[in-house]
Amino acid sequence: MVFTVSCSKMSSIVDRDDSSIFDGLVEEDDKDKAKRVSRNKSEKKRRDQFNVLIKELGSMLPGNARKMDKSTVLQKSIDFLRKHKETTAQSDASEIRQDWKPTFLSNEEFTQLMLEALDGFFLAIMTDGSIIYVSESVTSLLEHLPSDLVDQSIFNFIPEGEHSEVYKILSTHLLESDSLTPEYLKSKNQLEFCCHMLRGTIDPKEPSTYEYVRFIGNFKSLTSVSTSTHNGFEGTIQRTHRPSYEDRVCFVATVRLATPQFIKEMCTVEEPNEEFTSRHSLEWKFLFLDHRAPPIIGYLPFEVLGTSGYDYYHVDDLENLAKCHEHLMQYGKGKSCYYRFLTKGQQWIWLQTHYYITYHQWNSRPEFIVCTHTVVSYAEVRAERRRELGIEESLPETAADKSQDSGSDNRINTVSLKEALERFDHSPTPSASSRSSRKSSHTAVSDPSSTPTKIPTDTSTPPRQHLPAHEKMTQRRSSFSSQSINSQSVGPSLTQPAMSQAANLPIPQGMSQFQFSAQLGAMQHLKDQLEQRTRMIEANIHRQQEELRKIQEQLQMVHGQGLQMFLQQSNPGLNFGSVQLSSGNSNIQQLTPVNMQGQVVPANQVQSGHISTGQHMIQQQTLQSTSTQQSQQSVMSGHSQQTSLPSQTPSTLTAPLYNTMVISQPAAGSMVQIPSSMPQNSTQSATVTTFTQDRQIRFSQGQQLVTKLVTAPVACGAVMVPSTMLMGQVVTAYPTFATQQQQAQTLSVTQQQQQQQQQPPQQQQQQQQSSQEQQLPSVQQPAQAQLGQPPQQFLQTSRLLHGNPSTQLILSAAFPLQQSTFPPSHHQQHQPQQQQQLPRHRTDSLTDPSKVQPQ
């Protein structure tokens, strides 16, 4: 029993130990599992992070679009870092040391300043003489565009006598096969030599001129420039020729002019269409300059105000500018030619100006000239000048297309200064901050004073080929332009032959389709201008026709009116006391000056020709404007005869009298005595006997007719004043007067001439002497004083002075007979067969009576 108890105790102890062991094992397993889980999590996190980094690194590697494994990504990353390290080392070696330049200048600005100071440009040449790069500064020094030199041989720009020497210098390194080591390229390959280079010209026909230059540079292997820093340079080399090209070297040099330049010329434009505005006086002095001008020309506004614009122009451009300014003064606006403007930094820049004249808003007088100046490049100037000369200008794209040719392995068109600097183990790149420095860095064209360094060639050297058809087209275009300007009426059909002729012209060999289309566009523009001018001329013609129609309507209204004249009879002769002018049924008695225009029949048609034109004209007197002229005057009606005077048809007219006839009341100082008859063949008697200060002209004559004309408003266009000196008969220009001939008195010239011939010469001389002794101050003398004298005829006229040169007076007739012949009944019954119709005079133009101002 005791044993049983002890056994039970022992079994319980064993069971307790087994359970504790099992529990311990379970605890240990749980701990290991937890550690394993955490370790797996951390490992997975690390792997995920590593994969993310590898993926990000692979995405940054260039040139491969396919998915790469981790080892490839790591390998390419190592290669990239290695090349980057090499590039950094090269950049550090080529970096300009800080003690060479001021700290405030960048490498680009310092490089441009050095080029300006050296009067040079960069040039990269292959060993066979092919030019692969040239800087833009060559334009201001040698007047060549970079596109003219790239892909060309250097020997084309060197005199023939220097070809062998230059070729020997460039090919020297080829004799040493082991000299192309990096050490040799860095230290022992500097080369310097002098030669002559051809200077460019606008006209290829001009004689060639060479400038003496100095080359200073080094041979550089193209493999020394890393692919990552080529900046597109590698793309210009075709892949099939790249291995052979990479084994070659080039000569990168700074080309300097032997003769320094004092006045620079900036030929390139960094930003197109740079412009500024200014205002000038009519004497072309600066009145205003806007804020955009100082960065371009260097002058502040106060520095140029008051100075003449011609002080800043190149002497060779003054003549063309003067012509442009004359055109501006004639037409009020225009565009100047290309010209050079001197900046404050003593540099020439090319400008073109659009200008117009502004006028005062009140008095319409020109105030000043507004100018908009645009900066242009030398390439544009040269292209325009060559177009004027009829020379084909090669397009810039053609030079760039040459680099696409697969048959040439060394035609490389580099486009920036950075590439040449990289070949020279330099890597500066132009920055936006160096814009002002670039403008001041371009050097000028060689001064003509440096002629000792120039070698002119024989003028028999054949010039560059140009297109004669293009030149002819340009000349034809200019001739069409001159015809369109000078012609007064141009039809639209004029432009059709020109367009068809231009379309039928054969395209010469070498002329591109683009150039031919540009010429057709110019011809189309000329055609549009001609059509526009034609439309303007047609509009002017229509307007003039409308004005002519209105004038004809006024003439018809004037011809529809009548004129009635009342003659007052006196004892010794005829005293015309009043003149009544009627229009329809109304009689206007207001005193109004009458403007008329007419012509004088030549004296040789009536007389022998001994009387000059000046003697035929009646001296005019000034009619003073007084208040009495505004008052109305009644028309005197007495023993008068109403006469209707016939008209004259057109005849030969000479010696026009440019004045206006005004019939007024008699005055003491306005007497003109005109003889009623004059001898035709008498050369001894003087026509004008007296001419006193009271403006009286007295003609010696026997029988005279005293007339008194009173001013009355006339609605017609002309009044014919009696004048026995010229014709011998009163004539008017109204066709309606012919309807009153049944009641009118018509006198013939033949009767007057017969009466003059029948009169003895002695009696005529006595009458002339007696008329010279008579001094009658007015026609208001009593009739009793004239009983003992033969009847005299006086004509008193007053004419208004005014500035219309077209107004003329016809003095064509007089009244030679006495008062007994004037009654209409007596004339109609006894003298019907003696009436004679004289030609009708027609005046050139009529003055509107409404526009006549009282004097």
Curated annotation (Swiss-Prot):
InterPro entries: bHLH_dom (IPR011598), CLOCK-like (IPR047230), HLH_DNA-bd_sf (IPR036638), Nuc_translocat (IPR001067), PAC (IPR001610), PAS (IPR000014), PAS-like_dom_sf (IPR035965), PAS_fold (IPR013767). Residues 34-84 form the bHLH domain. It is found in: Nucleus; Cytoplasm; Cytoplasm, Cytosol. Residues 450-570 are annotated as: Interaction with SIRT1. GO terms for cellular component: chromatoid body; chromosome; CLOCK-BMAL transcription complex; cytoplasm; cytosol; nucleoplasm; nucleus; transcription regulator complex. Residues 107-177, 262-332 form the PAS domain. The record marks H84 as: Important for interaction with BMAL1. Expressed equally in brain, eye, testes, ovaries, liver, heart, lung, kidney. In the brain, expression is abundant in the suprachiasmatic nuclei (SCN), in the pyriform cortex, and in the hippocampus. Low expression throughout the rest of the brain. Expression does not appear to undergo circadian oscillations. Pfam families: HLH, PAS, PAS_11. The keyword tRNA processing does not apply. Residues 478-493, 619-650, 818-837 have a biased composition (Low complexity). Gene3D superfamilies: Helix-loop-helix DNA-binding domain (4.10.280.10), PAS domain (3.30.450.20). It catalyses: L-lysyl-[protein] + acetyl-CoA = N(6)-acetyl-L-lysyl-[protein] + CoA + H(+). Induction: In the SCN, nuclear expression is lowest between CT7 and CT13. Cytoplasmic expression is highest at these times. In liver, peak levels from CT21 to CT3. Expression of both phosphorylated and unphosphorylated forms of BMAL1 with other circadian clock proteins occurs between CT15 and CT18. Expression in the heart oscillates in a circadian manner. Its main location: nucleus. It comes from the Eukaryota. It is an enzyme of class 2 (transferase). Residues 371-854 are annotated as: Interaction with NR3C1. Changing K67R: Decrease in sumoylation and its transcriptional activity. Abolishes sumoylation and interaction with ESR1 and decrease in its transcriptional activity. Transcriptional activator which forms a core component of the circadian clock. The circadian clock, an internal time-keeping system, regulates various physiological processes through the generation of approximately 24 hour circadian rhythms in gene expression, which are translated into rhythms in metabolism and behavior. It is derived from the Latin roots 'circa' (about) and 'diem' (day) and acts as an important regulator of a wide array of physiological functions including metabolism, sleep, body temperature, blood pressure, endocrine, immune, cardiovascular, and renal function. This is Circadian locomoter output cycles protein kaput. It comes from Mus musculus.
